[in-house]
Curated annotation (Swiss-Prot):
Principal place of residence: cytoplasm
Claim: Lyase is one of the keywords in the record: no
GO molecular function, a single term: phosphoribosylamine-glycine ligase activity
Signal peptide range in chain numbering: none
Disulfide bonds: none
Record keywords, A-Z: ATP-binding, Cytoplasm, Ligase, Nucleotide-binding, Purine biosynthesis
Enzyme Commission identifier(s): 6.3.3.1
Domain of life per record: Bacteria
Name of one Pfam family that matches: AIRS
Metabolic or biological pathway, per its Swiss-Prot or TrEMBL entry: Purine metabolism; IMP biosynthesis via de novo pathway; 5-amino-1-(5-phospho-D-ribosyl)imidazole from N(2)-formyl-N(1)-(5-phospho-D-ribosyl)glycinamide: step 2/2
Protein's recorded name: Phosphoribosylformylglycinamidine cyclo-ligase
One Gene Ontology term from the biological process aspect of the record: adenine biosynthetic process
SUPFAM superfamilies: PurM C-terminal domain-like, PurM N-terminal domain-like
Length: 351
């Protein structure tokens, strides 16, 4: 069979001509291997680069149940592109998934990432993955694999998207599902580090309206740094707390804020009544509310308002839990109590 004829003056095309640089992808793998190596832990059976990532469930688990989570960083990335600041969004990516699986009582074991772009910038991608590895170190899980997809025409130059996948394990008898929460239990709030990774479409709209100087000082750091502060990872302090006392329920305060996330762990017939004066509204949220003219109710269902994780314990355990978490470096407040739901009432109310 004769090969197809090409025009005499035509040159053969390569993948690079089509916009995909295999050499850049290889260079990125070489750059990120040291970051991934720092996250290695017991259970990892291979390095980065295989078709599949291997992990052996630790033998300490008698009846392990795997808990998985996946998430992205949302439109916070648009602000990262605008600021050319890529060192914190990797931690955001890890936090969004590991904090989610933590609320079931799971210890995060491993993490995989997906980085998609139109044209691969090796230095930018390496900066992002370094942040991912740092997030994995903070949560004690291994970065054991990932995918970098260079797709010409799919994303504008200088932009990318991220997705993360976390898998953890919990002893079957120790799954936390909120089923034991009862009237009189106490809701503790752990401080957030800032906006975390939700509500940024509204944040960007407020910035568009207010047109602030993002490099200006904002309570000791630039406004840009305050807006981009990475999502706090609560894994190690809360896993330690679970070894000492009974944690009945937890809620990662993400999209939907306090009023839509706490109900996810409450049985029907129970309401969490939160006292909005029980914790201080951080200056960044005051700034957003003032410059956006955002109503209180909207703030509570879009932003975390200074509380990144809610933890529900018995009243008898509340003081011990606060002391333990404070010693571990967390800021904690008693922000509410659990009571019977009144007719026509939501499962979380802020008073």
């Amino acid at each position: 069979m004769n090969p197809p004829k090409s025009a005499p003056d035509a040159q053969g095309l390569s993948y690079r001509d089509a916009g995909v640089d295999i050499d850049a992808g290889d260079a990125l793998i070489d750059k990120i291997k040291p970051f991934a190596k720092k996250t290695l832990r017991d259970g990892v059976l291979g390095g980065i680069g295989g078709f599949g990532a291997l992990f052996e469930v630790p033998k300490k688990y008698k009846e392990p149940v795997l808990v998985s989570g996946t998430d992205g960083v949302g439109t916070k990335l648009k602000l990262a592109f605008h600021l050319n600041k890529h060192d914190t969004v990797g931690q955001d990516l890890v936090a969004m998934s590991v904090n989610d699986i933590l609320v079931q009582g799971a210890e995060p074991l491993f993490f995989l990432d997906y980085f998609a772009c139109g044209k691969l910038d090796v230095d930018t991608a390496a900066t992002v993955v370094k942040g991912i590895a740092q997030g994995c170190e903070l949560s004690g899980c291994a970065l054991i694999g990932g995918e970098t997809a260079e797709m010409p025409g799919m994303y504008p130059d200088g932009e990318y998207d991220l997705a993360g996948f976390a898998v953890g394990a919990v002893e079957k008898s120790k799954i936390i599902d909120g089923s034991t929460i009862a009237e009189g239990d106490v809701v503790l709030g752990l401080a957030s580090s800032g906006i975390h990774s939700n509500g940024f479409s509204l944040v960007r709209k407020i910035i568009e309206r207010a047109n602030p100087d993002l490099s200006a000082d904002f309570h000791g750091r630039s406004l840009a740094d305050a807006l981009m502060a990475p999502t706090r990872i609560y894994v190690k302090p809360l896993l330690a707390l679970m070894q000492k006392l009974t944690v009945k329920g937890m809620a990662h305060i993400t999209g939907g804020g306090l009023v839509e996330n706490i109900p996810r762990v409450l049985r029907e017939g129970l309401t969490a009544e939160l006292d909005q004066d029980a914790w201080p509204l951080p200056p960044l949220f005051k700034w957003l509310q003032e410059h956006g003219g955002v109503a209180d109710a909207e703030m509570h269902r879009v932003f975390n308002c200074g509380i990144g994780m809610a933890v529900i314990v018995s009243a008898a355990d509340a003081d011990a839990a606060i002391a333990d978490l404070t010693a571990a470096g967390e800021q904690v407040w008693k922000i509410g109590t659990v009571r019977a739901t009144r007719e026509g009432e939501a499962q979380t109310v802020v008073v």
